[in-house]
Amino acid sequence: MTTILTVRKGNQVVVGGDGQVSLGNTVMKGNARKVRRLYRGEVIAGFAGGTADAFTLFERFEGQLEKHQGHLVRAAVDLAKDWRSDRALRKLEAMLIVANKESTLIITGTGDVVEPQHGALAIGSGGNFAEAAARALIDNTDLTAKEIVEKSLNIAADICVFTNHSLTIEEITIDAQLEDKSK
């Protein structure tokens, strides 16, 4: 599988993931790009699960973002509805983490759209390791969100055999006005 982690701290939202693609117990590729920008660069999305399935979901999600003019929550809810009700989509085995300046969400194939309670959220085989590390670093260090994502993904890669150290990290800087509204 893989590990995708997002951290929201200060004026940063960061999503990162490793690059390992496995087929069973065999590493097929080590530098896949599982985190990418969508909707004019305003949204960052990362996937864990089947690569082909994830690309299908990226396309569908980007379509929903266009339909809802970049409104992340509406697009996520509509994707989750489609994913749950469409026979072909229901068979897709992947999960998405999506984030913009206002929200961070996880979207699952069972129709769940969840916003994290804490500043970190992770999916994939190494997700629990990465999220635990990130939460500890958020609470106990002055590291930036990007530094936390990098360190946490490396910890997950040290523990999880389906996660490697080839990282893709994307970040969004939150405007001061938006940051004030969220407090």
Swiss-Prot record:
The keyword Nucleotide-binding does not apply. Keywords: Allosteric enzyme, Cytoplasm, Hydrolase, Metal-binding, Protease, Sodium, Threonine protease. Its main location: cytoplasm. Allosterically activated by HslU binding. One of its GO terms (biological process) is proteolysis involved in protein catabolic process. One of its GO terms (molecular function) is metal ion binding. The active site is at 2. SUPFAM superfamilies: N-terminal nucleophile aminohydrolases (Ntn hydrolases). It catalyses: ATP-dependent cleavage of peptide bonds with broad specificity. It is found in: Cytoplasm. The keyword Cell cycle does not apply. It comes from the Bacteria. Na(+) binds at residues 157, 160, 163. GO terms for cellular component: HslUV protease complex; proteasome core complex. Pfam families: Proteasome (PF00227). A double ring-shaped homohexamer of HslV is capped on each side by a ring-shaped HslU homohexamer. The assembly of the HslU/HslV complex is dependent on binding of ATP. Belongs to the peptidase T1B family. HslV subfamily. Protease subunit of a proteasome-like degradation complex believed to be a general protein degrading machinery. This is ATP-dependent protease subunit HslV. The lineage of its organism: Bacteria, Pseudomonadati, Pseudomonadota, Gammaproteobacteria, Oceanospirillales.
